[in-house]
């Protein structure tokens, strides 16, 4: 998931609420340490949804450095995940805290309220208009956000584009997140 730090509204004005929120480290850590994507992954792999988990930007076996070391193992080591392996039950990044972000959420809400951010923060995700599969998947993603972060903190809003994600959404920065 890629976060947009300069989101704009449909009139081209900066979305100060989102932009201030996403600039806050505790807010971003809530996304990273708190969102359980298991049901979202199940849209792709119903039997073993956590096989879809990817915390390393690429999948294992794709990239190697000049010493022959596999890229994802190097990243896992840097992230402190080098001792972690697929267990089929819990996403790797949720294991340390069990997905409990109550303290981070409280910290983020206090820090952000102090600078004028209002809650819930709206996170905009766009799908192609008329694509029922994309809508079903986005609805599951919205539920993951709701169950993991709470509707009092962040609400995922699903928007649509007609023909070009790049031209209609990404280029004009309407999105909060891209996948």
Place the predicted regions along the sequence by residue:
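Short helix-loop capping/hinge motifs at secondary-structure junctions, enriched
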Residues: 7-27
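Intrinsically disordered, low-complexity cationic segments
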Residues: 1, 121-124, 174
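Extracellular/periplasmic solute-recognition and catalytic clefts
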Residues: 1-11, 38, 42-44
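Short, flexible loop/turn elements at secondary-structure junctions
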Residues: 5-7, 35, 60-62, 125-129, ...
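Short, solvent-exposed polar/charged micro-motifs at secondary-structure junctions
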Residues: 2, 133-136, 165-170
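Generic recognition of flexible, low-complexity loop/linker segments
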Residues: 17-18, 107-114, 164-174
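Periplasmic binding protein-like
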Residues: 146-179
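Append "and occasionally in soluble cytosolic enzymes with long acidic Gly/Pro-rich linkers
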Residues: 21-148
């Amino acid at each position: 998931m890629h976060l947009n730090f300069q989101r704009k509204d449909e009139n081209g004005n900066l979305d100060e609420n989102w932009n201030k929120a996403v600039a806050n480290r505790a807010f971003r850590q809530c996304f990273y340490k708190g969102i359980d994507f298991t049901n979202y992954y199940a849209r792709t792999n119903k039997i073993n949804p956590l096989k879809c988990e990817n915390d390393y930007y690429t999948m294992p076996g794709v990239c190697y450095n000049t010493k022959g070391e596999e890229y994802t193992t190097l990243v896992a080591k840097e992230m402190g995940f080098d001792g972690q392996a697929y267990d089929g039950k819990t996403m790797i990044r949720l294991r340390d805290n069990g997905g409990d972000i109550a303290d981070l959420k409280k910290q983020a809400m206090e820090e952000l309220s102090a600078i004028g951010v209002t809650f819930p923060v709206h996170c905009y995700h766009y799908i192609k208009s008329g694509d029922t599969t994309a809508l079903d998947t986005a609805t599951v993603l919205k539920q993951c956000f709701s169950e993991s972060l709470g509707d009092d903190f962040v609400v995922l809003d699903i928007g649509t584009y007609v023909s070009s994600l790049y031209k209609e959404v990404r280029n004009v920065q309407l999105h909060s997140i891209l996948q």
